[in-house]
From Swiss-Prot:
It comes from Danio rerio (Zebrafish). Residues 187-206 have a biased composition (Basic and acidic residues). Its main location: membrane. Probable core component of the endosomal sorting required for transport complex III (ESCRT-III). ESCRT-III components are thought to multimerize to form a flat lattice on the perimeter membrane of the endosome. A motif (Type-2 MIT-interacting motif) lies at residues 170-181. One of its GO terms (biological process) is late endosome to vacuole transport via multivesicular body sorting pathway. GO terms for cellular component: ESCRT III complex; late endosome membrane; multivesicular body. The lineage of its organism: Eukaryota, Metazoa, Chordata, Craniata, Vertebrata. Residues 168-185 have a biased composition (Acidic residues). Belongs to the SNF7 family. This is Charged multivesicular body protein 6. Residues 167-206 are annotated as: Disordered. Residues 11-103 form a coiled coil.
Length: 206
């Protein structure tokens, strides 16, 4: 059971994978910092409004200066986040390119092995042999066609006609060999005479 449901083989983690992971972690930290600074700036802005209402203009001005400095920090943070994301994308795309190159390399090696088995010279040899065989067969056909005389042609046609006629005779039904019995020609006349004599006998009886 342990062998059937064992753990899958762990995927090998490369240096590029570690670099991408670190960059993403740094990006997430900067986003958390960005969010925290934004919330703090909103609170201090509300506090500056309240200080102005209370007539504490100097303190309100100090908070607004601090807010301006934090705006600059947010802008720098945004630039750093963009740089990190761009770096992550570049590394991931480079990994894809490496896989493509590895695939091309495997394909090229396979083609080289195939070319070693079937070189250009071998292909040309096969094509030449095929062409020679076709030409040789043509010559044989021409020799056979030209060697028959007119008498031979007529004999061939006569044999073909005989074969065709023989097949046609086989398809016809056979005529029965026994003779049919003859039908007497005077029978109908005698029958008529019987019919005529019958009424005469009936009249005599009456």
């Amino acid at each position: 059971m342990g062998n059937l449901f064992g753990k899958k083989k762990a995927t090998r983690v490369t240096e590029q994978d570690r670099a991408v992971l670190q960059l993403k972690q740094q990006r997430d930290k900067l986003k958390q910092y960005q969010k925290r600074i934004t919330l703090q700036m909103d609170k201090e802005r509300q506090l500056a409004k309240q200080l102005l209402k209370d007539g504490k203009k100097d303190k309100a001005l100090l908070l607004l200066k601090k807010k301006r400095y934090q705006d600059q920090l947010l802008e720098k943070t945004e630039n750093q986040i963009s740089n990190l994301e761009r770096m992550v994308q570049d590394i991931e795309f480079a990994q894809i390119e490496m896989k493509v190159i590895e695939g091309l390399k495997v394909g090229n090696d396979c083609l080289k092995k195939m070319h070693e088995v079937l070189s250009i010279e071998e292909v040309e040899k096969i094509m030449d042999e095929t062409h020679d065989a076709i030409e040789y067969q043509k010559q044989i056909d021409e020799m056979l066609a030209g060697s028959l005389t007119q008498e031979d042609e007529e004999a061939v046609l006569a044999e073909l006609e005989a074969i065709t006629q023989g097949e046609a005779d086989l398809e016809l039904p056979e005529v029965p060999g026994e003779e049919l019995p003859e039908v007497p020609e005077q029978e109908p006349v005698r029958e008529k005479e019987r019919v005529k004599k019958k009424p005469e006998r009936e009249m005599v009886a009456v």
